[in-house]
Swiss-Prot record:
Activity modulation: Na(+) is not transported, but it plays an essential structural role and its presence is essential for fluoride channel function.
GO molecular function: fluoride channel activity; metal ion binding
Any one GO cellular component localisation term in the record: plasma membrane
Topology of this chain in the membrane: Multi-pass membrane protein
Residues bound to Na(+): G76, T79
A Pfam family per the record: CRCB
Transmembrane spans: 4-24, 37-57, 65-85, 101-121
Xref: HAMAP family: FluC
Function: Fluoride-specific ion channel. Important for reducing fluoride concentration in the cell, thus reducing its toxicity.
InterPro entries: FluC
Official protein name in the record: Fluoride-specific ion channel FluC
GO annotation, biological process: cellular detoxification of fluoride
């Protein structure tokens, strides 16, 4: 594979994913006073999609360049571990320990659950 095509695929996917995350953040601003719903929703959606797509593309061939676009670019741009970590740290920094631990626990446990749900949906309904 041409490395330049890989770079372009990741850059384009990253732009789309980052814009989607920004749109989610804007859409959740009204309800996101005490809890970072934008990051939470973007990360869970990314987990669901990686479960769906990874499972699906184990059986259906797609090019390496398109995989880079989807997984490294789009889903990498949509999800954000650094923002999640900073938001969690912010809870601890302000003494909101229950919210911090709750956010940490919910994000990790529901993220893993969404990957599993994505795999299940893909195997049960898409890969018959």
């Amino acid at each position: 594979m041409d490395p330049v095509m890989g770079i372009i695929a990741v850059a384009l996917g990253g732009a789309v994913g980052s814009l989607a995350r920004y749109a989610i953040a804007l859409g959740t601003q009204k309800i996101a006073h005490a809890f970072p719903f934008g990051t939470f929703i973007a990360n869970l959606a990314g987990c669901l999609f990686i479960g769906l797509l990874w499972s699906f593309f184990e059986k259906i061939h797609i090019s390496h360049t398109f995989r880079l676009f989807l997984f490294t670019g789009l889903l990498g741009g949509l999800t954000t571990f650094s923002t999640f970590s900073r938001e969690t740290y912010g809870f601890f920094e302000t003494g909101e320990y229950w919210q911090g631990f709750g956010y940490l626990f919910l994000s990790i446990s529901l993220g893993l659950a969404m990957v599993a749900v994505g795999f299940f949906i893909s195997h049960k309904f898409l890969l018959r």
